[in-house]
Amino acid sequence: MSQFINNPEHTFGFDTLQLHVGQESADPASDSRAVPIYQTTSYVFRNSQHAADRFGLADAGNIYGRLTNSTQGVFEDRIAALEGGVAGLAVASGAAAITYTLQALAQAGDHVVAQKTIYGGSYNLLEHTLSQFGVETTFVDAHNLDEVEGAIKDNTTVIYLETLGNPNSDIPNIDAISEVAKKHGLPVVVDNTFGTPYLFRPLEHGANIVVHSATKFIGGHGTSLGGVIVDGGNFDWKASGKYAQIAEPNPSYHGVSFAEAAGPTAFATYVRAILLRDEGACISPFNAWVLLQGTETLSLRVDRHVENTKKVVEFLIGDSHVAKVNHPSLPEHPDHELYQKYFPNGGASIFTFEIKGGQEAAWKFIDHLQVFSLLANVADVKSLVVHPATTTHSQLSAEELAEQNITPSTIRLSIGTENAEDIIWDLKQAFAALDE
């Protein structure tokens, strides 16, 4: 147990946890204070019994590089601590984290209830890819609790949400939905990529599992892919009888019951031992190390993102070229009350606005930006822009786009940490180009 977690003498703050958890003292092999990159594929066992104990989960430790790595382990422990979870699992990308989580919970013949206003890639995963494996999804208006509960079936096994919807930053009532889930014995999975554990911790509001694209705010610099699954350790996998793969003896791992063997970390252990083992979307030690560097400054960067976003939103609502700003800090936004509840210190530095003039004006505006980069990533220290309808959400049908409130006029901004005056100057000069 980390000396920085559940310390009886002192409660450590977020800024301290993001620097220390996972490596509380110097590296024992080298005395290095910085976390080393353990660039290896495999590990030597002391003897045959030691090897058998590792594979049998009787002895925690490294088995093979596809499953665990010491650099990766520090990263996993740190993100789990920041989210308030009991275990973390780092994988190759955010998409892998989401896919493995849903595969672990929804198998052939099962049903998922999902928020309809989510990242286009996650929508496609649920609507098209997982459906090929016999998993059905009902997409719901997460603001309508009756609709959420009405969508639950006898074979429903998970409710899937995003803290801040992509791209419009709409906010589900996670507390209320979690109560519905508990009533039906279902786990709630929340993608907290846009929320960040610094601003919001879903596990404190009833969620059971949190996923991240660590590529975004956690890494923060647009250099390295990675994803994280955080196990809240707060769901009873045996109670409902729906999760035999976790609760009952698993024939794929010589009859181990992960609920029995791993206790509160059963979910993370199952995903690592079965899905990561078999499907192999493991994170590289180098990427885990790079993402650790980002984690150490997460709170510092997010504060600047939030500060700049407030100034940009204020500018946009006063510009004549803008038809609407979709930011939950604004009183007219339908999720303003939830924003005030969940994000008292601000948030949602990734949001959209509607430009007057449709797609032609949107493209012209985007093409004249100089500080903003046109690319598909978000949550970078650099300011970013994209046209969702023709890029990130282009696989959606016209009807699906309408359900997600994405139009040809929608522009998504990801506000970086540059000087706010420079960001606003760039927006001004791109708007001016529309008048030429």
Show which residues each predicted segment covers:
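PLP-dependent enzyme catalytic core of the Aspartate aminotransferase-like
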Residues: 2-3, 86, 127, 136, ...
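Conserved C-terminal alpha-helix-loop-beta "cap" of PLP-dependent enzymes
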Residues: 280, 302, 310, 314-317, ...
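Conserved N-terminal alpha-helix of the aminotransferase class I/II PLP-enzyme fold
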Residues: 47-99, 121-128
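Active-site beta-loop-alpha junctions enriched in small/polar residues
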Residues: 164, 193-195, 330, 356, ...
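Conserved PLP-enzyme active-site core in the AAT-like
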Residues: 3-10, 22, 26, 89-318
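N-terminal "arm"/small-domain region of PLP-dependent enzymes with the aminotransferase-like
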Residues: 2-69, 77-78, 411
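Short amphipathic alpha-helical segments
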Residues: 60, 86, 287, 291, ...
